[in-house]
Amino acid sequence: MIHTLETTVAGRKMKVDFGKTGMLSNAAIFMSYGDTVVMINANASKEPREGIDFFPLSVDYEERLYSVGKIPGGFIKREGKPSDKSILHARSIDRPLRPLFPNGYRNDVQIVNTVLSVEQDNLPEILAINGSSLALCLSSIPFTTPVAAVSVGLVDGEFIINPTVAQRENTILDLTVCATKERIMMVEAGGQEIDEETMYNAILFGFEECKNIVAFQEEAVAKLGKTKDEQVLYKADEEVEKEVKRFAFDMIKEAMYIMDKDERNAQLDKVKEKISEEFSQKYEDKGADIKEVIYKTQKEIVRNMLLNEDRRPDGRAFDEVRPIGCEVGILPRTHGTGLFTRGLTQVMTVATLGALGDVQILDGIAEEESKRYMHHYNFPSYSVGEVRPLRGPGRREIGHGALAERALEPLIPSQEEFPYTIRLVSEVLSSNGSTSQASVCGSTLALLDAGVPIKRPAAGIAMGLITSDDLEREKVITDIQGIEDFFGDMDFKVAGTEKGITSIQFDTKIKGLSNSCVKDALEGAKKARLHILGKIKECIPEPRKELSKYAPRTEIICIDPEKIRDVIGAGGKVINKIIADTNVKIEIKEDGKIFVTSNNEPEGVKKAISIIEGLTKEVVQGEIYLGKVTKTTNFGAFVEILPGKEGLVHISKLDFARVEKVEDVVSVGDEILVKVTDIDNQGRINLSRKDAIAKKEEEKDK
């Protein structure tokens, strides 16, 4: 039986059909918002997965190009692996939901969001977060706290819920807020240097609308929700926990109080060896339980240290940033490099400039077709001193790369100001917390070193949180390192300039953040950001005046758009010849702007521009031109006076004396002065060598 429920969000209808599709799924809903439709299916394994120490939740976000009436590009005409955007949207769905599952739940859970129809005014990723929450709540899977999501824009000083395409074009803020009815679960934002107060108010504005959507979900669950399955939650054996803590608590505590990370880890390894020696025979089949007890003990000690002793593992104050190091220009042949170090976290970012034709072509459901600025993030195993195979980028690498990219996007100059494609690659050399925000800092250094005229330098910082079990007490921590991230409750990343915020991403391991915590984190991040920006400016205060000698050079010329066809030629014949003859790259825009780029061959750029100017220049009647003879006939000579533009010098116009044979006066390849005497109604050009000579003689006499 099909059940339909409706509500209104931002003046548009949100509709849910339950029982319409996916009859064999634990829960399946067909959800629409305007003409955007997403199908969400939620399922869980019947038994917990053995031998793991994490919750195996997987979220998939599947874009179908038929949803926007497109056929996939390329040779294979079907969707392949998920796009980067699909991966980012899947991560955005995962983050607010994961903390709300019961601790110790080890059953595999999969949520599949399939985008079936897209109206660009209504973002499918926002609908998918709401639908994933509702599907879980309606299912028998032990998930009981609804989560809602909205997008918030800022146009002309007014906040807008779920802005349309036209509004998104004018917004200076792109914010996603996810929340339960009581607390904020997740925030993602990109902005054009938004001040902290405005950002905080925008988050609260979105939070209020989330409460209405949560109420709608609660109504749906009350009517249609299944009875929840009996939970089988993993918990370490009580006897094992008691015995291991009795034996090792003091040793673990002593190790955890060592400030140096390497020394601390070395001491912990020794403690683990002692625990193994003590209990390997007594609890030979309880290895997972022993491992869990060690983890819980470490977590208890670190959290108590932070919350009750006002002490951080490395001895810093709660608002103190680790020592900062900045260096530029360390790679001699690249276009720009930045090496950023914060404590034991170190990132090297390399900037590469290319022609506008080097943009990344996108084949997705969004209207955006290409990307001129991109940032890629690599996290090799050696950055944490581990050994593992090096594969392609995973979801984490893609997510961190996009986060750092978003932080700098509002600061990148337009293609008119800086006619280059820009690629940044951040190599994580050492990781001890917040490498994504170190990538923002490294990217700023690399851009400045490359001579990219960014509006202002940007920096990023990660804020952390420790709360009491009842959530009544909380402490915000500046510049969290790995141990504080691992055992803490929040990773609140903020990037921006001295003027304001350009990106935010935060998620939490607890059941949401209070409003005051969000405000404190924003204020603490600003203080830390300004400190880091000061260090960056000490290293390189402004973009270099000159590009690297190894970087390409681009020149811009403007022509009449009606003349574009003359530059391209039939089947691209003309432009391809220019490219082949001058060894340049040429990008033509519809408005008549032409970008000519060459790698270390400035003469090629000049030659190409000269040819293009000739192709688009109008032949003026009465003007004298220096042309080249291209062909002779018995009635005259054809002369090219501009690239691709020929005229005829009749035999009677070649000389003052009578000419019997054209070749007696000119030959193919000769350069001669000619005057344009006439252009007929078919565009044919008549020339005269005789009149050109006469005019030059007349000018000499004057």
From Swiss-Prot:
Cofactor requirements of the protein: Mg(2+)
Reaction(s) this enzyme catalyzes, per UniProt: RNA(n+1) + phosphate = RNA(n) + a ribonucleoside 5'-diphosphate
Enzyme class of the recorded protein, top EC level: transferase
Residue ranges annotated for the KH domain, each copy included: 552-612
Molecular function in Gene Ontology: 3'-5'-RNA exonuclease activity; magnesium ion binding; polyribonucleotide nucleotidyltransferase activity; RNA binding
Keyword presence, Nucleotidyltransferase: yes
SUPFAM superfamilies given in the database record: Eukaryotic type KH-domain (KH-domain type I), Nucleic acid-binding proteins, Polynucleotide phosphorylase/guanosine pentaphosphate synthase (PNPase/GPSI), domain 3, Ribonuclease PH domain 2-like, Ribosomal protein S5 domain 2-like
Entry keyword set: Cytoplasm, Magnesium, Metal-binding, Nucleotidyltransferase, RNA-binding, Transferase
GO CC term (a single one): cytosol
GO BP annotations, alphabetical order: mRNA catabolic process; RNA processing
Record-listed Mg(2+) binding positions: 485, 491
Cellular compartment(s): Cytoplasm
Any one Pfam family match given in the protein's UniProt record, by short name: RNase_PH_C
Domain S1 motif: 622-690
Principal cellular location given in the protein's record: cytoplasm
Entry's EC annotation: 2.7.7.8
PANTHER family with a match to the protein in the record: POLYRIBONUCLEOTIDE NUCLEOTIDYLTRANSFERASE, POLYRIBONUCLEOTIDE NUCLEOTIDYLTRANSFERASE 1, MITOCHONDRIAL
Similarity comment: Belongs to the polyribonucleotide nucleotidyltransferase family.
Name of the featured protein: Polyribonucleotide nucleotidyltransferase
Taxonomic classification: Bacteria, Bacillati, Bacillota, Clostridia, Eubacteriales
